[in-house]
């Protein structure tokens, strides 16, 4: 699943409108909707704000698998 789909699911699961989340991020509803459509990249500072708000990890929002990061061995 893409991060923008996860953003939308989190918002809906928490019964929030795009306007409410946009206000949290100090942006407009129109601009926030473009995050959910994948038309604008999500800035890191917004990612951090959303992680704290929804109480999830950045890995979760970014759709990364649990466990060790790609390409890293245990011996590093």
PLM feature segments, named:
Residues 62-76:
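Short, charged recognition helix plus adjacent turn
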Residues 26, 45-60:
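DNA major-groove recognition helix of helix-turn-helix/homeodomain DNA-binding modules
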Residues 5-24, 49, 74:
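Short basic helix-loop element that most often maps to the first helix and adjoining turn
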Residues 25-41:
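Recognition helix of helix-turn-helix/homeodomain-like DNA-binding domains
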Residues 7, 21-22, 32-35, 61:
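Conserved hydrophobic/aromatic packing and binding residues within compact polymer-binding modules
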Residues 3, 7, 57-58:
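Hydrophobic side chains within well-formed alpha-helices
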Residues 34, 38, 49, 67:
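Alpha-helical DNA-recognition elements
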């Amino acid at each position: 699943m893409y991060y923008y789909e996860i953003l939308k699911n989190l918002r809906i699961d928490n019964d929030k409108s795009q306007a409410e989340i946009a206000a949290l991020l100090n942006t407009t509803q129109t601009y926030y909707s473009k995050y959910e459509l994948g038309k604008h990249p999500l800035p890191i500072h917004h990612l951090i704000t959303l992680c704290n708000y929804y109480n999830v990890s950045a890995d979760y929002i970014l759709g990364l698998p649990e466990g060790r990061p790609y390409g890293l061995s245990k011996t590093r």
